[in-house]
């Protein structure tokens, strides 16, 4: 187990480029199961969750060629399907939530899948019902083997149909799409997630020979095809990392440029920071965040307290609420954060309160932050990271604090952020990785 030692109070300045999007990578890498031809994917982030998924694919026989650090070629022409039943595979799947994205491709191409109940962040209940209901609509049968804690899913031949999803689940939509592209007939998915990650997934599948229309909307139409072929695909910059860097620049920056962010795919993210008073300038495909000596939280027209809430795309991603909350601790004014999609992602605020932040945790979904307006710096502290997004938020808090902090369980940060301490140290941070 490793920790970060952070010497806070050092201004960050310079240029930083976001990694490839973690959530997109997990999806598009799994599409390679759908064809026996090579699929090349570039801008793959070198992070724990993605690397673990690639290892899982290798275990079932996917041939993986690493052309360079962020460039891979995958070929699934000799898969070892019997390995899916092994205890070793079940154990490996149980620690990685991204493994759930193997369900759809395996079911679509081979008509069966046996996958462990996946792991991931401990951020409350994260249902798989949407995935299973979608597969059931397509004609699959599934059984939960409680003794081994695995899901056994089978279908002789999936058949297209109309389905209305009960929630716009991103991974659920992705899984259903990957199952449906090889199904017989036409599948219509209403209330589909439409995040840029889903759009990218659909574009890759179409390049592989799928017939998907309605991309970027919540109504997708998929005409099943007999076979998919190889293709090439480049992963988008990670919008969550872009938002994290905006937060760092607001709290600790003396002028930071975030390069090649794909502005058109950021949606409401820059405006969410602007509502906290943070200056975010768009310059070409870059974002520039100047030094923020003060930033003032907006209020609604009727004068009531500003509320920031997560919502399905094109709403605000829940993955950035933790970062926005930390930024608000040094703003002028008050803001209510409403975390609707997960019921325990706000529980990390007790660590910020220990650092001197003024936060009222109303319930598991809501917290009110009263900003210090940079008049009272956060205190350093010792803390343990509960999940990826809380981890990066606490790292930002520690960098802005006066003094030295220690953050444990940084493997959570490594799951989603590539070489984070090295990249931030190049901007002027003082972060050291140590073994516990």
Question: What is the predicted function of each stretch?
Answer:
Residues 1-436:
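Short, structured segments at the rim of ligand-binding sites
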């Amino acid at each position: 187990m490793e920790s970060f030692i952070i010497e806070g109070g050092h201004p960050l300045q310079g240029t930083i480029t976001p990694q490839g999007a973690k959530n997109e990578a997990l999806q598009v890498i799994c599409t390679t199961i759908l064809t026996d031809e090579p699929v090349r994917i570039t801008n793959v982030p070198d992070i724990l969750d993605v690397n673990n998924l690639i290892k899982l694919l290798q275990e079932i026989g996917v041939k993986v060629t690493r052309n360079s650090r962020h460039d891979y070629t995958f070929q699934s022409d000799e898969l070892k399907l019997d390995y899916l039943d092994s205890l070793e595979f079940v154990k490996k799947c149980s620690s990685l939530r991204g493994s759930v994205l193997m369900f759809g491709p395996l079911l679509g191409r081979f008509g069966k899948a046996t996958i462990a109940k996946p792991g991931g962040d401990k951020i409350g209940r994260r249902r798989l019902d949407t995935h299973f209901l979608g597969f059931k609509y397509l004609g699959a049968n599934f059984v939960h083997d409680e003794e081994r804690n695995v899901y056994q899913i089978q279908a002789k031949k999936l058949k297209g149909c109309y389905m209305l999803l009960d929630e716009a689940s991103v991974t659920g939509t992705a899984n259903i799409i990957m199952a449906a592209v090889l199904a017989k007939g036409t599948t219509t998915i209403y209330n589909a997630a439409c995040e840029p990650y889903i759009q990218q997934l659909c574009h890759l599948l179409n390049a592989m020979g799928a017939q998907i229309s309605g991309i970027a909307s919540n109504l997708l139409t998929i005409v099943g095809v007999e076979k998919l072929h190889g293709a090439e695909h480049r992963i988008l910059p990670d919008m969550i990392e872009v938002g994290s860097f905006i937060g760092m620049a607001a709290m600790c920056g003396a002028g930071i440029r975030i390069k090649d962010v794909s502005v058109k795919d950021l949606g409401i993210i820059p405006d969410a920071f602007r509502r906290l008073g943070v200056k975010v300038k768009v310059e070409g495909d870059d974002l520039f965040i100047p030094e923020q000596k003060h930033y003032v939280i907006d209020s609604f027209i009727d004068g009531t307290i500003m509320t920031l809430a997560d919502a399905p795309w094109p709403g605000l991603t829940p993955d950035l609420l933790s970062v926005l909350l930390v930024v608000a601790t040094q703003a002028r004014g008050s803001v209510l954060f409403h975390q609707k999609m997960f019921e325990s992602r706000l529980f990390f605020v007790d660590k910020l309160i220990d650092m001197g932040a003024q936060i009222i945790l109303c319930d598991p979904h809501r917290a009110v932050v009263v900003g210090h307006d940079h008049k009272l710096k956060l205190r350093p502290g010792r803390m343990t990271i509960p999940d990826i997004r809380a981890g990066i938020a606490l790292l930002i808090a520690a960098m802005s604090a006066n003094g030295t902090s220690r953050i444990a369980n940084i493997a959570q940060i490594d799951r989603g952020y590539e070489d984070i301490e090295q990249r931030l140290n190049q901007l002027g941070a003082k972060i050291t990785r140590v073994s516990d």
